[in-house]
From Swiss-Prot:
Organism encoding this protein: Drosophila melanogaster
Cystines in this chain: none
Residue numbers on the Cytoplasmic membrane side: 42-110
Name the record gives this protein: Glycine-rich selenoprotein
Gene coding for it: SelG
Residues spanning the membrane: 21-41
Classification via InterPro entries: Se_SelK/SelG
Keywords, comma-separated and alphabetical: Developmental protein, Golgi apparatus, Membrane, Selenocysteine, Signal-anchor, Transmembrane, Transmembrane helix
Membrane topology: Single-pass type III membrane protein
Side Lumenal, residues: 1-20
């Protein structure tokens, strides 16, 4: 692949210079940093409150819609819906054994 450097020279491939080595180590540093930040995210108090697109955490912006079905009803809401924060760790349920899964055979032909 052709590479054009910052001086306008055309190279067959990108040369190994000081800038490329520094970029490589900085990239590795930020990747390791982000990895550990994601490991520690549940234990920190920062819940991305400064991000205006995400609201405030786990759906703290509006309550859960209520009613529905036959006649509607008022918009219910969870208790403490404006608090934000992380949800508690809950068990989803047990993993079903393979024999109870309803899926087609390998080819999907019937």
């Amino acid at each position: 692949m052709v590479y054009i450097d910052h001086n306008g020279r055309v190279w067959e491939k990108r040369p190994w210079d000081w800038r490329r080595i520094v970029e490589l180590f900085v990239g590795i540093w930020f990747a390791i940093k982000q990895l550990f930040l994601t490991f520690l995210a549940p234990f920190t108090g920062n819940n991305n409150q400064a991000n205006p697109r995400r609201g405030n955490g786990w759906g703290g912006g509006g309550g859960w819609g209520g009613g529905g079905g036959g006649g509607g009803g008022g918009g219910g809401g969870r208790p403490g819906s404006g608090s934000g924060g992380l949800r508690p760790n809950r068990r989803i349920g047990r993993i079903q054994p393979t024999m109870s899964c309803n899926m087609p055979a390998g080819g999907g032909u019937g």
